[in-house]
Amino acid sequence: KYKRVQDNNNVLSPQKINLKDIVAISAATGVNSNLDKDDEKLDLLNDNTSGGHTLALDKNGNVWAWGLNNKGQIGTNTDVKFEQIQLGFTTNGYTNDEGVVEGDSEWHKEYDAETYYTYIPSQENLYITEPTKVVGLEGIGYLNSISEISAGGNSSIAVRNDGYAYAWGNNDNGQLGDGLSDNASMPMQLLSGTKNPYVTYFRDALYVDMATDHAVITTRDGEVYSWGANRNGQLGNGATSVKETSPVQV
């Protein structure tokens, strides 16, 4: 019943999304849409907010995503390309022929013979304006048998019925929990971390919440694990560190 980002314009009133049998949704910053459970097309039971993209879970366990895809958070196994443009330097900022270009964490500048350049995301694959099925591991098939979803910042995570978890998107702070810090445009399986050093992947996950720079998961036994940025002790493991790239117990 409510529309997030399916065109290039802001939407000031609720609009239907072309999806059926949805049981959960996790939406981007600025959206708090409690959808009507009796709606003939959408059957949404809960929603929460994150940052720039939207996840939806249907009754068959498939995950759908749309919106901003600058970090691969839509999970389509497609990367956003960057284009180089030349900028003139002024005391007020960097400008090109079209005017001032504001800074962004995605942009980088180089100095070469008194010429400044910046790299900006191209429009190709940057915005996914229609609900798109999230691909499976290694880009094969699609995620399935999913019971929980959460979108946070520019990252996404899902829990499968068998207790395994998968994350994709921004990984600057290790919030995908795959032991790395590289962004991923397709799901990466969550490592076991300190839960069980004798197995590779996390098992028995029940609920999950992806924040802007870290994530938290609860198990069927009531244990809580977290991973990602920890400069402010947000992982709750009794320590502070730059980041943890796999789960640690709270």
Regions found by a protein language model. Name each.
Residues 1-250:
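Eukaryote-biased RCC1-like beta-propeller repeat architecture
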